Structures are given as structure tokens and as C-alpha cells.
């Protein structure tokens, strides 16, 4: 596996392929892996320009999704589940569309903390550093010591901005519904995502909604409960045949 993905558990079990939130990278999923260890083979994306991946950041979500798809080289006979949080949720959705067009069906698609693609999003990537940082901090999930050190925070700004630009500029022209079972995860205090969650019905043939305590970054505050839901999903759905 190249620098685009990190494997936490090499095995022949179902693959759980994870895509991080804006500014995140493979290590963002280590807490989740701690609760799922031995239950699946977790592959976590290391986006260009993030973590140990020193290649140039990509500010085009379609290009980034194609890059992941090419690198994964998924097989119809190997069961896998896609999981993405926030920006990673949109990548998960788009990747599922592309794979299904080629007859490769995920066992399940888990879309977490993201509004559906037809919803207009507020653009923030152009904001001055202080305002942009404030927006990121308000989403929650940032360690207090990191929030208090704006010099350290500013070090991560370029990767955050690149990710936000990719999401803000994304335009979807593929209207295909996902045929695989879709699970939508949201935090109860994430008002925008909760408000627009039903909109995902437009994009999925079979959809289930899950709610967790917390806000947009409930993945970090409710990790054990998220892991329990994912474990149930891993064991719930049979492998879909094309």
C-alpha cells in the first residue's frame, strides 16, 4: 500500500476503508481502530499534503476521489465497507458512485457528518486566518492545548484550506443513487447536518439514519459508540453481487 493509505490490520477480513475530515489524515482514525481491532482490516486515507504524505495537496474533490479509487484497486470478490467523516463523507459517497458504475459494490457505505451534495454550503476557505481558525475551532474536536496555541494551529492551516476549497468547489453531475446500503451518521448538536439529513434519501436506494450525542466532531467524542455501530454494520449486510 502506497503513502495514500495506511493499513492498521492486514487481514482477510472485511476491509473498512476510512476517509478523514478536512485537515485530517490516517492517524485521525487510530482511536476508532482501537475499538475495532481484530474485527476488520482498517485502511485509512493519508491525503496528499497531510500527515506523512508529502505530495502536493489536491484541491479538486473529483480528482482526489479518482486518485483513491485507482490506488485501492478494489475487487468485486473482496468485501469492504466505505466510511468517511465530514469531507471524507462526500468522498465516500462519490467513490461509491464510481465503483458501482463499474460493478463493484461496497458491503455498506457510511456517510458521516456531511450534508447531501445538492445542499448549498457556506464558503469559508477565503476567510482571513483568525476567522478561518475560529470556524474550525467552533466545529469542536480540537484538543484544548492545540486550540490555545494558534501558532501551532496556523501550521495546519494550508491543509485545512485545501480541503475546504475542494469541498466548496465540488459540483456533482452524476445523479445515480447508491445501490449498496447507506448509513448516515450525525451528531445531535450538528444542526445543519441534522436539518438536511433526510436529503440523503435522494441519493440512496436503501438508507438508515443514526444519531449520536455531540456536535459535528462526535467521531472524536463518541468513538466507542461509533465503533459499536460500525461493528454492527460490518456484520449486518451480506455481500452484494453485481
UniProtKB/Swiss-Prot annotation:
PANTHER family: S-ACYL FATTY ACID SYNTHASE THIOESTERASE, MEDIUM CHAIN, THIOESTERASE. InterPro entries: AB_hydrolase_fold, TEII, Thioesterase. Pathway: Antibiotic biosynthesis; surfactin biosynthesis. Its EC number is 3.1.2.-. GO terms for cellular component: cytoplasm. Its main location: cytoplasm. Coiled coil: none annotated. The gene is srfAD. It is found in: Cytoplasm. It is an enzyme of class 3 (hydrolase). GO terms for molecular function: hydrolase activity. It holds the Pfam family Thioesterase. Belongs to the thioesterase family. Keywords: Antibiotic biosynthesis, Cytoplasm, Hydrolase, Sporulation, Stress response. Induction: In response to low temperature. It comes from the Bacteria. One of its GO terms (biological process) is antibiotic biosynthetic process. It comes from Bacillus subtilis (strain 168). Probable thioesterase involved in the biosynthesis of surfactin. The lineage of its organism: Bacteria, Bacillati, Bacillota, Bacilli, Bacillales. The active site is at 86. This is Surfactin synthase thioesterase subunit.
Amino acid at each position: 500500500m502506497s503513502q495514500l493509505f495506511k493499513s492498521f490490520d492486514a487481514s482477510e477480513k472485511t476491509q473498512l476503508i476510512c476517509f478523514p475530515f478536512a485537515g485530517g489524515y490516517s492517524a485521525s482514525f487510530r482511536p476508532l481502530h482501537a475499538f475495532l481491532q481484530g474485527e476488520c482490516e482498517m485502511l485509512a486515507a493519508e491525503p496528499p499534503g497531510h500527515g506523512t504524505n508529502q505530495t502536493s495537496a489536491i484541491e479538486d474533490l473529483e480528482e482526489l476521489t479518482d486518485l483513491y479509487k485507482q490506488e485501492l484497486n478494489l475487487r468485486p470478490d473482496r468485501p469492504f465497507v466505505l466510511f468517511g467523516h465530514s469531507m471524507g463523507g462526500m468522498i465516500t459517497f462519490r467513490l461509491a458512485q464510481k465503483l458501482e458504475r463499474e460493478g463493484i459494490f461496497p458491503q455498506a457505505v457510511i456517510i458521516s457528518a456531511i450534508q447531501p451534495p445538492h445542499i448549498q454550503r457556506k464558503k469559508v476557505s477565503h476567510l482571513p486566518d483568525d476567522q478561518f481558525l475560529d470556524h474550525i475551532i467552533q466545529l469542536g474536536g480540537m484538543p484544548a492545548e492545540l486550540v490555545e496555541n494558534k501558532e501551532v494551529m496556523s501550521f495546519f492551516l494550508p491543509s485545512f484550506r485545501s480541503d475546504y476549497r475542494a469541498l466548496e468547489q465540488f459540483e456533482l453531475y452524476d445523479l445515480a443513487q447508491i445501490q449498496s446500503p447507506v448509513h448516515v451518521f450525525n451528531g445531535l448538536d450538528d444542526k445543519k447536518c441534522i436539518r438536511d439529513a433526510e436529503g440523503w434519501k435522494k441519493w440512496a436506494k436503501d438508507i438508515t439514519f443514526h444519531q449520536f450525542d455531540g456536535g459535528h466532531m462526535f467521531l472524536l467524542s463518541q468513538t466507542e459508540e461509533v465503533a459499536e455501530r460500525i461493528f454492527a454494520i460490518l456484520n449486518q449486510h451480506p455481500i452484494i453481487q453485481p
